[in-house]
C-alpha cells in the first residue's frame, strides 16, 4: 500500500555513482485529513550489486527504525533443510569476525537501541530502532550481522538447546499446533508452504556450522536484500552508509520458489491436558499479485472482523461457543488463505463447526448485507491508514511488495480498488469457498472429541 514513483536524483556524487533507479514517492495518505507535518515521502534506490534501499521519511517521529530484509525463509528450504532459516537468524547474533555476542549487544545498547530479528515463510528480517543521528551506525551494525556472522560451533550447540525449548513450547500450544497442521492440510508435506518455519527436531539436531555458512552464502545475496529505514531521515547519509556497508555483498540471483498447489483435508492432534479444542479451517485465496484477493479480504472482514460481525455475533454473543473466534486472510507472495479460527470447549466443538458452515452457506446463498459491507470497508480503510503511521508495519509491508510485485503500491489506489469491490463479488467469494472441487483445509488440536472429528470430516460436503 505505497505510492507510485516520481523522479529523484541523489545529491551526493558518490551516491550517484553507486545507485540507480532512484525514485521519490509521496505517501501522504489523505491530505484532507492529515496535518501537513505528518506527510511522508518514500525514496527507492538500488546499489550496483542489486541491493535495494528503501527510505520512508517520517519527519514528525523522534526515532528511526532500520530493517534488513532478506528474501529467504522456510519457503526456500528443502525438506532436508527445513528450519535452517530460523537457525541462521538465531545464530546471526552469536558473533561476527569482529564482534562476539556480548559486543553486538553492548554496541547496540550503548546507542540506546536493541537489535531483534524474525523468520517468516518468505523472508528473514533484522531490526534496530534508535536515534536518527545514529542511523549510519545502525546500518554498519546490521551489515556486520548479516554479512559476517561466524556461526561459532560452541554457540550452535548451546543454541540448539534454546531452540529445543522453543519446540517444546510450540508443541504444548494447541493454537500453534493447529496452525502448523492447517498449513500441512492446505499444501501437503511435499511443498515448503506446508512445512513449519521452526523445522523439525531431527533437522535442528543435524545442522552444523558448515550447513549454516553454506546456506547464508547462497541465500544472503544482494539481489535478495532490501535495507529499509523509516523515521526522520537524511537520505544521503543513509545511502552512503548502506553503500559503504553492503556494496561488496555478492549480487547473486533472486531466490525464487514455485507456487504451492492447494490440497485441503483434515488434520487432527490430541494433546494431553488441554481443556480446549482449537479449530482452524480455511480455503484457497489469491496471491498478492492478483487483485481479486481484495474481494477475499473484504469478505473476511465482513464475516469476522469486529464484535458486531456475523461470526462473533453468532458464535460468541448468541451461542457462547467460543471466547475467541475470527476470520482473516493471509495473502502471500505465492498463494493466499481465507481462514476462520476459534477456541472452543471440546463438548461444543461440533456445534462450533456446524455454526461456521451455516454462516458461510448463508453468505454464499443469500444477499450480502449492505450495512455490514460498509462496516467492513471502513474497518479495512482505518486499519490500512493506521499501518501507514507505524514504521515497522510500513517497512514490512513495503519490503513484501518489492519482493513480490517489484514496486510499491500507492495507498489511495489500493483503497480505491477496495471501494470498487461489489457486493456481488463478495458473494461470489463465499460461493467459491464452498466449491467441492477445492476442499477446505481443517485442523483440530487440543482436546478433540470423536464427534468433532467426524463433523469436521463431513463439513461442506
Where are these regions (language model features)?
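Short pre-active-site segment immediately N-terminal to the catalytic Zn-binding motif
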Residues: 73-81
Amino acid at each position: 500500500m505505497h505510492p507510485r514513483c516520481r523522479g529523484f536524483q541523489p545529491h551526493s556524487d558518490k551516491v550517484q555513482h553507486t545507485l540507480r533507479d532512484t525514485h521519490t514517492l509521496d505517501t501522504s495518505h489523505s491530505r484532507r485529513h492529515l496535518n501537513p507535518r505528518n506527510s511522508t515521502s518514500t525514496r527507492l534506490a538500488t546499489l550496483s550489486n542489486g541491493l535495494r534501499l528503501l527510505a520512508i521519511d517520517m519527519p514528525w517521529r523522534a526515532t528511526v527504525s532500520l530493517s534488513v530484509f532478506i528474501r529467504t525463509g522456510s519457503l526456500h528450504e528443502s525438506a532436508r533443510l527445513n528450519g535452517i532459516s530460523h537457525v541462521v537468524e538465531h545464530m546471526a547474533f552469536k558473533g561476527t569476525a569482529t564482534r562476539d555476542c556480548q559486543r553486538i549487544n553492548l554496541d547496540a545498547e550503548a546507542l540506546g537501541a536493541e537489535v531483534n530479528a524474525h523468520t517468516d515463510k518468505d523472508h528473514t528480517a533484522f531490526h534496530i530502532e534508535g536515534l536518527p543521528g545514529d542511523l549510519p551506525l545502525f546500518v554498519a551494525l546490521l551489515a556486520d550481522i548479516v554479512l559476517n556472522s561466524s556461526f561459532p560451533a560452541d554457540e550452535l550447540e548451546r543454541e540448539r538447546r534454546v531452540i529445543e525449548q522453543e519446540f517444546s513450547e510450540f508443541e504444548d500450544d494447541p493454537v500453534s499446533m493447529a496452525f502448523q497442521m492447517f498449513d500441512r492440510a492446505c499444501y501437503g508435506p511435499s511443498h515448503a508452504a506446508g512445512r513449519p518455519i521452526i523445522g523439525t527436531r531431527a533437522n535442528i539436531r543435524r545442522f552444523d556450522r558448515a550447513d549454516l555458512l553454506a546456506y547464508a552464502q547462497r541465500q544472503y545475496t544482494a539481489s535478495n536484500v532490501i535495507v529499509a529505514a523509516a523515521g526522520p531521515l537524511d537520505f544521503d547519509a543513509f545511502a552512503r552508509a548502506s553503500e559503504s556497508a553492503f556494496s561488496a555483498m555478492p549480487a547473486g540471483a533472486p531466490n525464487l520458489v514455485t507456487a504451492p498447489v492447494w490440497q485441503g483435508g483434515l488434520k487432527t492432534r490430541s494433546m494431553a491436558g488441554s481443556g480446549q479444542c482449537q479449530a482452524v479451517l480455511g480455503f484457497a485465496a489469491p496471491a498478492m499479485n492478483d487483485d481479486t484477493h481484495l474481494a477475499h479480504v473484504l469478505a473476511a472482514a465482513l464475516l469476522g472482523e469486529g464484535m458486531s460481525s456475523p461470526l462473533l455475533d453468532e458464535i460468541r454473543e448468541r451461542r457462547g461457543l467460543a471466547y475467541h473466534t475470527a476470520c482473516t486472510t493471509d495473502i502471500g507472495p505465492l498463494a493466499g488463505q481465507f481462514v476462520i479460527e476459534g477456541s472452543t470447549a471440546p463438548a461444543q466443538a461440533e456445534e462450533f463447526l456446524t455454526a461456521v458452515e451455516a454462516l458461510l452457506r448463508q453468505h454464499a446463498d443469500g444477499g450480502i448485507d449492505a450495512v455490514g459491507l460498509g462496516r467492513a470497508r471502513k474497518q479495512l480503510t482505518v486499519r490500512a491508514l493506521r499501518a501507514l503511521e507505524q514504521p515497522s508495519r510500513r517497512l514490512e509491508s513495503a519490503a513484501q511488495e518489492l519482493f513480490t510485485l517489484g514496486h510499491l503500491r500507492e495507498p489511495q489506489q489500493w483503497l480505491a480498488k477496495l471501494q470498487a469491490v461489489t457486493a456481488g463479488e463478495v458473494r461470489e467469494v463465499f460461493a467459491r469457498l464452498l466449491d467441492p472441487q477445492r476442499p477446505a483445509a481443517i485442523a483440530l488440536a487440543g482436546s478433540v472429541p470423536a464427534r468433532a472429528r467426524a463433523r469436521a470430516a463431513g463439513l461442506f460436503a
